């Protein structure tokens, strides 16, 4: 691949041509791999690991993370696209195919001896015009918490990752989960939506739990497995004897001294446990009230036995991330000490129960009032399907979050690309000189999205583009109906793209494409490139 680097005495123009050819072929190659995934009619890819592990996905981020990419230019494009997903949660595939198409459209001008700098300048002008047009084209929503609008956004995102029937099933749960944790004038924290997986049943199923699901159960056979009307104590207190943080030795002379030392340790832990039992007896003054302890640290067998005899359900070693979720879902305060226990520090839930599935235990905390945390429970027959649903669910949550924060939407189905192409054609007429060739290349590259949507749906790309452009010329906002291949109104059909995703795609892709076009030589660097660029002894 890099054999050209080793050639000596080659002409500068020849080297530049080879470097450009290398970069363009890398962009087009990565584009050809991912373009078939785009849209609701996109195909799946099978990833096979070295150990024989198999993963089925059409998510661009998953593919680019898991694929082994040897080509340096392709790796650069992949890093750019995955950064897009880290920022906005979507648009990875669109970014890759846009960069690839920009390089592809530039190639024909380069073959006519147009300097790459001219094309790059055209890209810069077209990028600014495209982003300005996006500001005009977006549709500002007065109420971004409108449930119907958010359902349309979630459905558009999920249908590109999952079969339509499964995506429609998940849509309402994604929207309801976000609306549940939303606090006015505060940023949305998606970590407050726990995604829990359970492998069983014959088909994929997803449910929203307005509470919490913990992936462990009780550790004592006599503890209650189901409680109603529960007070919940969340704490981070060690209910077992712990070794000191500094090395310490305790010396004893005989067996009686050792027994007294062990008894002293047990009494110390048992005293903490009795404080919990006393609080339980204070608040549970009627038989219909119950008590649950969820501890981040350990609970030793003696304390578990004491709690079980008092009728308390005790869970130990809860995950750290679940402690904040518990307090947001159930109320109360997470306690780091048992010295100041009061009824005010307790949360409440109508139902707490344990469910066993094979060798796994799950604890459900349901029936909470005004929860600001929830759990989306995914059930599926295979690990592959569960992972596919989980990846799509994360993208759906990010899509709804982006819409709430953007306070606007963009008509989807390729509508923006068709409209932006027409606007750039008008803009090109106002520019003089060869820079307009870069604008033309950028405009042609925009059409790769509707073309790919049409091709993946089984329709002729050129015929489809002509139909869409003719309809747009009549003054209509028009997108592609992937079912029929005909133009449709994306607003009335409820098909929307995310403003922040499109803005990031058309801000970053021309920058990367321009940088790749301006590379005239590829040089193999030494091992010290990651370290200091200053030779030793010259600092």
From Swiss-Prot:
GO MF annotations, alphabetized: ATP binding; ATP hydrolysis activity; ATP-dependent protein folding chaperone; unfolded protein binding
Subcellular location: Cytoplasm
GO cellular component terms, A-Z: chaperonin-containing T-complex; phagocytic vesicle
Alphabetically ordered keywords of this record: ATP-binding, Chaperone, Cytoplasm, Nucleotide-binding
InterPro entries reported in the protein's UniProt record: Chap_CCT_zeta, Chaperone_TCP-1, Chaperonin_TCP-1_CS, Cpn60/GroEL/TCP-1, GroEL-like_apical_dom_sf, GROEL-like_equatorial_sf, TCP-1-like_intermed_sf, TCP-1_chaperonin
GO-annotated biological processes: protein folding
Superkingdom of origin: Eukaryota
Main localization, broad class: cytoplasm
PANTHER family named among the record's database cross-references: CHAPERONIN (PTHR11353)
Family indicated by similarity: Belongs to the TCP-1 chaperonin family.
Entry function: Molecular chaperone; assists the folding of proteins upon ATP hydrolysis. Known to play a role, in vitro, in the folding of actin and tubulin.
Subunit and interaction comment: Heterooligomeric complex of about 850 to 900 kDa that forms two stacked rings, 12 to 16 nm in diameter.
Name under which the protein is recorded: T-complex protein 1 subunit zeta
Organism: Dictyostelium discoideum (Social amoeba)
Encoding gene (name): cct6
């Amino acid at each position: 691949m890099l054999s050209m680097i080793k050639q000596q005495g080659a002409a500068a123009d020849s080297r530049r041509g080879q470097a450009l050819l290398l970069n363009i072929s890398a962009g087009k190659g990565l584009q050809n791999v991912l373009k078939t995934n785009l849209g609701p009619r996109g195909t799946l890819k099978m990833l096979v690991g070295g150990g024989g592990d198999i993963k089925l996905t059409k998510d661009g981020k998953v593919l680019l993370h898991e694929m082994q990419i040897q080509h340096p230019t392709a790796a650069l494009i992949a890093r750019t696209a995955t950064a897009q997903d880290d920022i906005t949660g979507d648009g990875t595939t669109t970014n890759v195919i846009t960069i690839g198409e920009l390089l592809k459209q530039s190639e024909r001008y380069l073959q006519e001896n147009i300097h790459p700098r001219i094309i790059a300048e055209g890209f810069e002008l077209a990028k600014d015009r495209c982003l300005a047009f996006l500001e005009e084209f977006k549709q500002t929503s007065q109420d971004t918490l409108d449930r119907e609008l958010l359902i349309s956004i979630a459905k558009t995102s999920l249908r590109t990752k999952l079969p339509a029937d499964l995506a429609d099933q998940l849509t309402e749960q994604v929207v309801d989960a976000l609306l549940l944790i939303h606090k006015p004038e505060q940023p949305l924290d998606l970590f407050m939506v726990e995604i829990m997986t359970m492998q069983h049943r014959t088909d994929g199923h997803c449910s929203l739990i307005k509470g919490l699901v913990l992936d462990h159960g009780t550790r004592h056979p006599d503890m209650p497995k189901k409680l109603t009307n529960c007070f919940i104590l969340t704490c981070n207190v060690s209910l077992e004897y712990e070794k000191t943080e500094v090395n310490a030795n305790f010396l004893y002379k005989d067996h009686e001294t050792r027994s007294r030392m062990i008894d002293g340790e047990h009494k110390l832990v048992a005293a903490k446990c009795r404080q919990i039992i006393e609080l339980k007896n204070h608040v549970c003054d009627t038989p219909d009230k119950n008590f649950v302890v969820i501890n981040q640290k350990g609970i030793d067998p003696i304390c578990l036995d004491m709690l079980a005899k008092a009728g308390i359900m005790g869970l130990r070693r809860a995950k750290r991330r679940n402690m904040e979720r518990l307090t947001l879902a159930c109320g109360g305060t997470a306690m780091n000490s048992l010295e100041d226990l009061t009824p005010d520090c307790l949360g409440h839930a109508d139902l707490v129960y344990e469910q066993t599935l094979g060798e796994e235990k799950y604890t459900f905390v349901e029936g909470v009032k005004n929860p600001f945390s929830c759990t989306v429970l995914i059930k599926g027959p295979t690990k592959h399907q569960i992972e596919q649903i989980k990846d799509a669910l994360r993208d759906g949550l990010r899509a709804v979050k982006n819409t709430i924060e953007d306070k606007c939407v963009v008509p989807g189905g390729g509508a923006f690309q068709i409209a932006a192409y027409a606007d750039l054609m008008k803009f090109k007429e106002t520019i003089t000189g060869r820079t307009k060739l870069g604008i033309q290349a950028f405009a042609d590259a925009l059409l790769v999205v509707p073309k790919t949507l049409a091709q993946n749906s089984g329709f002729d790309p050129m015929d489809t583009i002509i139909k869409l452009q003719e309809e747009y010329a009549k003054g209509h906002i028009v997108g592609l109906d992937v079912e029929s291949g005909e133009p449709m109104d994306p607003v009335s059909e409820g098909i929307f793209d995310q403003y922040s995703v499109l803005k990031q795609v058309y801000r970053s892709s021309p920058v990367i494409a321009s940088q790749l076009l301006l590379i005239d030589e590829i040089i193999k660097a030494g091992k010290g490139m990651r370290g200091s660029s200053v030779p030793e002894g010259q600092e």
